[in-house]
Amino acid sequence: MADSKLLAPELSDAESMGEETVRFQELLLKASKELQQAQTARPESTQIQPKPGFCIKTNSSEGKVFINICHSPSIPPPVDVTEDELLQMLEEDQAGFRIPMSLGEPHAELDAKGQGCTAYDVAVNSNFYLRMQNSDFLRELVVTIAREGLEDKYGLQLNPEWRMLKYRSFLGSISQQSIRSQQRPRIQELGTLDTHDSLGTRHGPERPHLNLWLEAPDLLLAEVDLPKLDGAQGLALEIGENRLVVGGPQQLYHLDACIPLRINSEASRAAFHHRRKQLMVSMPLLSASS
């Protein structure tokens, strides 16, 4: 993910960062305060009642396992991409695409034969669920992500083989779930700021438009607009502890943003959104004590 050639020596000089960095720091710190105030002013979570969708059957070493795939309008939808775009992202092993879902607690149930089993409720966005109903590909993807999420959360080892129940949309009863309720404060788009390298007399790579926001106190997201590109081929990305550097193929783009937060570069991920022609970057933040 790193390419040290992208770091221009003159940009490492604090004096060259100029007014843009100062304004950026003010905007980012303001957004951090807004997020903290929002968390104080409202409950961190809200209760939702998912609606039934479909139920799949699999198993673990401890017996039968059923997963109720549910939906709720309160769950945020994933980024709107076509199946072709999503398939290409997955083939390129990019981790920028996420399907928000709520993983419920295990509950003991009885199957059709009256034998004991375990059921889990997994909720996704209602509009996305409607789209998933007409797509075997999305259904397979959601089940795979749900299964892996349950394995990670509860230390399970589930059989990847599964089948969907024909005549039951859920097993047992679907309980309420708690989801995070805070909104993400947008940070002013840096592409609109006046910078020395955006003056009309400047020649060389174009500085792309950058959007940043705090998804949570420990997660910073970025969108870099690259309208001249059709894919990620030739893109160079470097993420430092407080630096985001993007270089385009054939010197089309160059972005060097100093971020006054500590980024976990090892855990950061990026994906190219083909329809929007954007580079999406997910950057977990390090705690002050780490």
Swiss-Prot record:
The modification Phosphoserine is found at S12, S16, S173. Keywords: Nucleus, Phosphoprotein, Transcription, Transcription regulation. It comes from the Eukaryota. One of its GO terms (molecular function) is phosphoprotein binding. It is found in: Nucleus. This is PIH1 domain-containing protein 1. It holds the Pfam family PIH1. Involved in the assembly of C/D box small nucleolar ribonucleoprotein (snoRNP) particles. Recruits the SWI/SNF complex to the core promoter of rRNA genes and enhances pre-rRNA transcription. Mediates interaction of TELO2 with the R2TP complex which is necessary for the stability of MTOR and SMG1. Positively regulates the assembly and activity of the mTORC1 complex. GO terms for cellular component: cytoplasm; nucleolus; nucleus; pre-snoRNP complex; R2TP complex; ribonucleoprotein complex; RPAP3/R2TP/prefoldin-like complex. The gene is Pih1d1. Component of the R2TP complex composed at least of RUVBL1, RUVBL2, RPAP3 and PIHD1. Component of the PAQosome complex which is responsible for the biogenesis of several protein complexes and which consists of R2TP complex members RUVBL1, RUVBL2, RPAP3 and PIH1D1, URI complex members PFDN2, PFDN6, PDRG1, UXT and URI1 as well as ASDURF, POLR2E and DNAAF10/WDR92. Interacts with phosphorylated TELO2 and mediates interaction of TELO2 with the R2TP complex. Interacts with phosphorylated ECD, EFTUD2/SNRP116, RPB1 and UBR5 and with RPB1 in a phosphorylation-independent manner. The N-terminal region is required for binding to phosphorylated substrates while the C-terminal region binds to the other R2TP complex components. The record marks K57, K64, K113 as: Interacts with TELO2. PANTHER family: PIH1 DOMAIN-CONTAINING PROTEIN 1. GO terms for biological process: box C/D snoRNP assembly; chromatin remodeling; epithelial cell differentiation; positive regulation of glucose mediated signaling pathway; positive regulation of TORC1 signaling; positive regulation of transcription of nucleolar large rRNA by RNA polymerase I; rRNA processing; snoRNA localization. Belongs to the PIH1 family. InterPro entries: PIH1/Kintoun_subfamily, PIH1_N, PIH1D1/2/3_CS-like.
